[in-house]
């Protein structure tokens, strides 16, 4: 695997020097300062690429070129935003950047309720608490019809939880959910959030798939033409939330994408922490079935709790993800490619490390502190080395 590291640009508290010292050779970044929908110019791409290369690194993957909400709802100037997206892909290819991670999650990107969940060893992790989320949706957001998405027991638990919350607790929970996490391109006030949710009132899973298919049929031929590989990121968490449909959550969704636009430019990001939240997702089977189309991997693990919809981010080699079998399947896919004459390594980044050690005293991007990811990268690197030596050394 090609070892990479997500970097949020010049304002990231983790520097490119830190990235290089961690042992990564590739950088995963994006032009976050450019508003959603606007074209990334060759000049802006080259400026960022030069900064990365001056540090002795390579810009390996774009994460992400965000998709304007008009495209997802098929309203407003969606055709203009698609044309702009096409041009951005052409410009990236002109600059020698050929792997693009993106997602099609409506309104919100990845969602958590607690950004500072304290683990038994004192480090901090990200957590999604189903009951706290229900408390937000039922008693703070007050979304009409939300009760239908929860069991009677969950509704009762959410009411009790809400009753114990201080005003600061409510404000923090609201911020965590709607204010935008690292990599998310949209942040909202509560009223703006309600308005954005309302735009999906008549959009179910079938309709959102229809809009996604329209996007893919416009984008993938351009990507194919210029040599760009599109790698869709799964929903996080991989199930409907807030009354919004989710359409990249299961192996069936992956198969639908391939059947909708059967081009090798139409590929996947294997995010084990997102897909792995669902017990019915067999990660190794996903890799084996769609290996030739996996162009990027996010390796992390989560641990489901007593309520299986509640989870927190575990250490990279613990939790519900069998990281050994996952890495072995990825390495096998790379060797399959090599046997066919390709030396195409799959970029991998350690995802969402714990906040730990000296980083506990620093201001960090949630999930993206340096030391926890350094630990995760080192552990995954060790697993890969052992697999390479045990099964593939001559």
Curated annotation (Swiss-Prot):
GO biological-process terms attached to the record: D-glucuronate catabolic process
InterPro entries: Man_deHydtase, Xyl_isomerase-like_sf
Pfam family, one: UxuA
Molecular-function annotations in GO: ferrous iron binding; manganese ion binding; mannonate dehydratase activity
Domain of life the protein comes from: Bacteria
Keywords carried by this UniProt record: Iron, Lyase, Manganese
EC number: 4.2.1.8
Pathway stated in the Swiss-Prot or TrEMBL entry: Carbohydrate metabolism; pentose and glucuronate interconversion
Cofactors that this protein relies on: Fe(2+); Mn(2+)
Catalysis: reaction(s): D-mannonate = 2-dehydro-3-deoxy-D-gluconate + H2O
NCBIfam families associated with the record: PRK03906.1, uxuA
Function comment: Catalyzes the dehydration of D-mannonate.
Family (UniProt): Belongs to the mannonate dehydratase family.
HAMAP family (alphabetical): UxuA
The protein's name: Mannonate dehydratase
Native species: Salmonella schwarzengrund (strain CVM19633)
